[in-house]
Amino acid sequence: MAIEGLIKQGFVTMSLDRVINWARTGSLWPMTFGLACCAVEMMEAGSSRYDLDRFGIVFRPTPRQSDLMIVAGTLTNKMAPALRKVYDQMPEPKWVISMGSCANGGGYYHYSYAVIRGCDRIVPVDIYVPGCPPTAEALLYGIMQLQDKIRRTNTIART
């Protein structure tokens, strides 16, 4: 976080947008939506080797407590309404990471009658993590890209 100005006696001045975005990037609470083998790599990212807790990322069991949804795996026609319902239950601001080839565009099962060809047809996606399955490092990089995106957004509406 860059300092815009320093005043005497240790006071720092900066825009409220930057303070809010700094707080949001340091406390992402993802709600996991594991549908296939990509979910195993998502669980690996939460283990002690990669330790998402050091980034302030704490997995939440309910959508009402989370601001990030990680969709990992093949999204079928039967699961699409459940995905949308969970997304609608999340409070604003909310972000979505699409993890893996199946979540991004259908993957190996792209031409199947039962598969949605990308979860972005159901919910708006902010970050796409490629791979089949993507590694835990790729998910970590995607989360860092999301943090950069959050830092660049304006949170306070200007008229």
UniProtKB/Swiss-Prot annotation:
Q: Name one GO biological process term.
A: electron transport coupled proton transport
Compartments, as annotated in UniProt? Cell inner membrane
Any one Pfam family match given in the protein's UniProt record, by short name: Oxidored_q6
**Keywords, alphabetical:** 4Fe-4S, Cell inner membrane, Cell membrane, Iron, Iron-sulfur, Membrane, Metal-binding, NAD, Quinone, Translocase, Transport, Ubiquinone
- Catalysed reactions listed for this entry: a quinone + NADH + 5 H(+)(in) = a quinol + NAD(+) + 4 H(+)(out)
Zinc-finger found in the keyword field? no
EC numbers for this chain: 7.1.1.-
Give the signal sequence positions.
none
Instruction: Show the GO MF annotations.
Output: 4 iron, 4 sulfur cluster binding; iron ion binding; NADH dehydrogenase (ubiquinone) activity; NADH:ubiquinone reductase (non-electrogenic) activity; quinone binding
Cofactor mode of binding and number, as noted: Binds 1 [4Fe-4S] cluster.
Q: Which InterPro entries match?
A: NADH_UbQ_OxRdtase-like_20kDa, NADH_UQ_OxRdtase_20Kd_su
Instruction: Report membrane topology.
Output: Peripheral membrane protein
User: Gene Ontology cellular component?
Assistant: plasma membrane; respiratory chain complex I
Q: Which cofactor does it need?
A: [4Fe-4S] cluster
SUPFAM superfamilies attached here? HydA/Nqo6-like
Q: Which residues bind [4Fe-4S] cluster?
A: 37-38, 102, 132
In the record, the note on similarity to other proteins reads: Belongs to the complex I 20 kDa subunit family.
- What is this protein's function? NDH-1 shuttles electrons from NADH, via FMN and iron-sulfur (Fe-S) centers, to quinones in the respiratory chain. Couples the redox reaction to proton translocation (for every two electrons transferred, four hydrogen ions are translocated across the cytoplasmic membrane), and thus conserves the redox energy in a proton gradient.
What is said about its interaction partners and assembly?
NDH-1 is composed of 14 different subunits. Subunits NuoB, C, D, E, F, and G constitute the peripheral sector of the complex.
Q: What is this protein called?
A: NADH-quinone oxidoreductase subunit B
Q: Which organism is it from?
A: Vesicomyosocius okutanii subsp. Calyptogena okutanii (strain HA)
